[in-house]
Structures are given as C-alpha cells and as structure tokens.
UniProtKB/Swiss-Prot annotation:
Key word Protease present: yes
Name of the protein: Probable Xaa-Pro aminopeptidase P
Keyword annotations of the record: Aminopeptidase, Hydrolase, Manganese, Metal-binding, Metalloprotease, Protease
Binding site for Mn(2+) 1: D425, E523, E537
Organism encoding this protein: Blastomyces gilchristii (strain SLH14081) (Blastomyces dermatitidis)
GO MF annotation terms: metal ion binding; metalloaminopeptidase activity
Function: Catalyzes the removal of a penultimate prolyl residue from the N-termini of peptides.
Gene3D superfamilies hit by this protein: Creatinase/methionine aminopeptidase superfamily (3.90.230.10), Creatinase/prolidase N-terminal domain (3.40.350.10)
Family: Belongs to the peptidase M24B family.
Assigned GO CC terms: cytoplasm
Amino acid sequence: MGPVDTSQRLARLRELMQERKVDVYIVPSEDSHQSEYIAPCDGRREFISGFTGSAGCAIVSMSKAALSTDGRYFNQAAKQLDNNWMLLKRGFENMPTWQEWTAEQAEGGKVVGVDPSLITASEARSLSETIEKSGGSLQGVQENLIDLVWGKKRPARPSEKVALHPIEFAGKSFEEKISDLRKELQKKKSAGFVISMLDEIAWLFNLRGNDIPYNPVFFAYAIITPTTADLYIDDEKLPAEVKKYLGDQVSVKPYGSIFEDAKALSQSAQKKSDGDASTSPSEKFLISTKASWSLSLALGGEKNVEEVRSPITDAKAIKNEAELEGMRACHIRDGAALTEYFAWLENELVNKKTVLNEVDGSDKLEQIRSKHKHFVGLSFDTISSTGPNAAVIHYKAERDTCSIIDPKAVYLCDSGAQYLDGTTDTTRTLHFGEPTEMERKAYTLVLKGLISIDTAVFPKGTTGFALDAFARQHLWKEGLDYLHGTGHGVGSYLNVHEGPIGLGTRVQYAEVAITPGNVISDEPGFYEDGVFGIRIENIIIAKEVKTTHGFGEKPWLGFEHVTMTPLCQKLINPSLLTDGEKKWVNDYHSKVWEKTSSYFENDELTRNWLKRETQPI
C-alpha cells in the first residue's frame, strides 16, 4: 500500500492543538488497554500517518511530523509515509528516540499533549521527565484529538458477543484462577487488582470474544479483591449462558463505569489512610505496569497504587497440561493444512503454470485451514510474500497492489490460526525453481539458528535475552543479522503475541526467566532489502530435561517443538550442516510424516509432496 495524503488531516489536527494550547501531540499505536493488535476504531496512529504496521508512535508539532517504528517495519514505513512525515528508525545510531525528538520539539516551554488512556503511568512519568529537561511539559488531553479529526468516518466500537471457553481446553476453572490470584494479592498485602489487559481478562474468566481482529478478546475491565470479583463489560455482550456461568460469584457492571468506581476506591483508600503521609501496602491497589495513565490517575496515582508485572500475565504464560495438549494437537492439524497448501501451490505454479498473486495464495490457505477441527479464524494477517516482498518483515499483501507469485523466486509464508484448543504461528520459506547459492546459504544459516534454539539446554533462571544469541551466532559469523526478535510468547486460543517471555534483546526478556510450560516461537531470519527474505518459524514448549551432571542441583530446561510442517529441502545446503544438525532435520521430518501423513490417505498430490519433502538429507 502506497502513501496516503495526510495534509488535510494534519492541518485539522494542528487547528485542534492550537485551540487547546498544545504545541506537540503524541499519537501512540495502542488502545486504552495497551493492546498490540487493536480494533479498527482505535487505529488512530494509522489514520493520522498512513502507516499500517502494528508498532510505532506518531508525533506531530505545529511544523513537523515524525513516525517512530522498529526494524520490522522500516521498509514498510518508508513506502507508506508521505512527504509530511520523517521516519525515526528505532535503535539506529545517531537517530533520536521518539521521546528525545518530542523533547526537542518542546524546547522553550512548549506543551506536549497525549491522551492519558493510551500510555502507561510509567511511560507518562518517564516522558514527563525527558520533556521537562528541555523546558517543556507533558499534559494529559482527555478528549482524543485524532477522534475529532476522524469524525463520523471513525469505525464504531465493536460489541460482539462473548463466548465460554470450555474447561476441556482451558484446563482450569475461573474460580480456581481467581482463588490463585487472591493468594498473590494476599502475599502482596494488597486491597485488590485492577485488570485492564484484554487477554488477561479473557484468560481469567475463561471467556473469549471477537472485538479485535485475530485476537479472541473483548472490551472489558475487572477488579478482583479478597472478597469480590467485578467484571466491567457492556451488558449486551453477555449471552444468557455466560451470565448464568458467572453466577453470583462475579458482579457484572457497565464497561464505562470503571473510572467512576476506581475513583470511589481511591477515595475510600484515602479515608482509610486517616491523614497518614502514605497509604499502607494493605490499602493499595495493584495495577499492571501496562495499565493506562488515566486508570492510575483515577485510582489516586502512586499514593494508592502499586504498579507490578501482572501476576495474571505470569500465570497465563505457564500453560497447564490441557493447554499444552491442545497446542500439540492444533499444530498437527495446522501443519497438515500448510502441507496441503504448499503442495497445491507448487502444483499450480510449476505444473499448471497458473498465474496466482500473493492474496490468491493467502486466501487458499485460509480456505484449507477452515476445514480443520476447532478452527475459529486466523491469528494474524497472513504474510504471503514473493521475491523482494519477502524482505519486508511484516509485509501485508493487498489484492489491488500485490505481486504475482514468482516460481523462480523465494516465497515466504508466515501464517497462523486460532483453534479452540490453541493458537498457531508458523513461517516457511520455499523455492519452486532453482535458488541461488546465496539464498541456500542464508536459508541454511537461519535453519542452523533455529536448531540451536530448539536443541538448547540451559539452567533454570535463564532468560530469553540470554538465549537470543544462540539463534544469531551462525549469521554473525558471516557478518549477517536480522532486525527483529527471535521469538515471542504464544497464547492458548488467545493472542499470538503474548508476554512476558520471549527470545530477544527487549528489556522485558531479560527480566523473566524461561519456565516449563512456556510456549514460544523460534523464528530467526535474514533479509536482503529489495532481493529476498528468509524466515523459518517453529513453536516450541519449554520443559525440564535430564542432563549428565545437573550442576548446581537445580532443574535444567530444554524445548519440545510442536510445529509439524516440512522444511524446504531445495533451500538446504547440507554441506553447511554438522552431522548433528543433519540428524535433527531428518528426525524432524520423520516426525512430521508420522504425525500428518494420515491426513492425506485420499490426497495423492499432497501425500507425494510430503513424502518428497520429508526424505532424509
């Protein structure tokens, strides 16, 4: 998708800024629940800038506009931003962060405005300090200015019905989960926990929704105290069976009343403090470090609130046995779907000489997936990319502008699905012609990185920050690298990107150790701008493993892979693999055949393709 002319939108925004005496205005990507993926009505940063990537921040002054994003989106942003915008490349030397750039624009006593519901309290504090150093000030602007510019064309807020997530898939009742949470509150001597993250609420109550594309969540807040459980959700979203399920253990309140109730809790806490300089820990409410600034302010700020890494996020990341079994099962079905798709695609392109574009491919894959048991929908926009487009890390094909799939070029497909028993995310890079030596070399180095993570053995307490280099080492030796993390947590029929764990250089990945039951992606890559891109992705489960010595008398961990989709034999250069790596590839392919071949008893085309692609190297 090319640039959108943002001139009129920026002019109107600047008029509104002037009326409110705001000199610089910040437009984050997130919604009021700090969601990574958002509903169309919350796509404010995309609306004002024209940039459609999932991560980034827009900043508008009276004379300039800047968009900051990370390495996944540099190419995409360069193509989508019009001449009104400058691109701030996150992590580049001599390139200011968006916070630093904002502070520069605020020099001389200028006012920086932001909707306080769209940034966290800690972000607001940090940003305020940075801006004050340059002589400016940060101000919360309650009325969102982008919404005013958008006007009647802004999409309506979704109000989809909520559904029960059966115990056979959840593995634990919501009553047990709330009981566990209350034990954590007791340890912290806290008055309660105010929950704002949508996937945490869905997981806690064993409910699923459809308010955000690809993410089975719903708009809600919740407050859990030692004796009460309140769910803030619009009543029309709850079918009778859900109301009956929640029973008298959960009080249902209007979504919009959360701030009023938070303020009442704040006032109650202030009364209990009885004039003391600070409220005792037992009177403080916990909020996630990802809760909004506006929610923190409603609760009375730091005096009444303790910001913590959410205990729900930690619990949700450690999958129980029912969830793990679901992840194993859905990845077998998903692997069968991908195998059928790749066999079909090769036959169409090579044997039938059919002309197919990238969207034709992604549509066919969704059609194949939809036939499988427990399928609900996709877990993110399928990345179906040919040739140079594969070098755009988060490429999104649009029917009117996408490319014809070239059988003589690399084809990268990153896709996933939501099933009732789990969430999938798999990337495979293929070639239907004769790959170049550089393509084979890059693919094999990436494969070596994937195997290094898959076979890693490490002591309890090791973080994903520490493991990240395992995947990069083979590329680094050749002076190559990739500008994205190596892996992210994956939800269980929830968000495909799930914290707090992952593999990469993000600060949060250095704070949380890998734990048995964590489900993580393993996805190294390599991208040559304008030429080709390589990425291979499996989903892995952390587990305890036996070692020869067990140094330190503590558990040692490793991984189990659950993705069951063949690698591309044509792109592997066996001479670059060790004997151990060749054995891994052969063992993996043997397992893929064992787990998925039965799906193709009556499909000779796919069965033959699978047999060929799983032969020993």
